Regions:
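Interdomain linker/hinge connecting the two RecA-like lobes of the SF2 helicase core
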Residues: 6-10
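Conserved AdoMet/S-adenosylmethionine-binding subsite of the radical SAM
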Residues: 22-149
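Short cysteine/histidine-rich metal-coordination sites, predominantly Zn2+-binding motifs
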Residues: 14-27, 170-176
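C-terminal accessory extensions appended to soluble enzyme cores
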Residues: 134-176
Length: 176
């Protein structure tokens, strides 16, 4: 179950669905463009990059382009489960233009597959007791998310997910 289905995040998203919070895509991108240069920000606390406008099971390249444009000079990042060939191509472009899109692997084996695309950084969810860095069967280094390991490190102070990197970030599963 996704963490956005429970607790405070679920309450927030219910209000968004009722139209009590949030805004439309174009306004959202315009607001992001107004952030100061160099500003670190994360997109999509829950959910994913938008689906193609024609309903195909691929990300929407126009909306991704708007997000990339809004991010110019900033340090935005997100995560995606869009892994079809077309999406991989657009993720590669977004990363080349400085909007960091982390490809989310569903298994250690998939890490190696996604890394082979060379479209951008990769992350993976690990068992809850994962504490040691390791290498995948394909030899890719997986580093346990520092913010999950030390109380004095936060996403804002670490910033590893926003960096261009060859290292995979592993997130130990948590919650219910």
């Amino acid at each position: 179950m996704c963490s956005s289905d429970l607790g405070p995040l679920a309450l927030h998203w219910a209000a968004v669905s009722r139209g009590q919070r949030g805004t439309d895509w174009n306004t959202h991108c315009a607001q992001l463009a107004q952030l100061p240069d160099g500003q670190l920000w994360r997109a999509h606390q829950a959910g994913d990059l938008p689906r193609a406008a024609d309903g195909r099971a691929t990300l929407d390249p126009v909306k991704l382009g708007q997000l990339v444009r809004a991010n110019m000079g900033k340090r935005g990042f997100t995560y995606t489960h869009w892994k079809d060939a077309e999406s991989i191509q657009w993720v590669r472009h977004a990363n080349q233009w400085g909007f960091r899109v982390n490809l989310s692997a569903d298994s250690i084996e998939e890490v190696d597959t996604l890394m082979a695309h060379q479209a951008g950084p990769v992350v993976v969810v690990l068992p809850p007791d994962a504490r040691e860095n390791f290498r995948t069967p394909g030899g890719h280094r997986v580093v346990i998310c520092p913010a999950t390991q030390r109380e004095d490190i936060t996403c804002a102070s670490c910033q590893l997910c926003q960096r261009e990197r060859d290292t995979v970030i592993g997130f130990p599963a948590h919650g219910t």
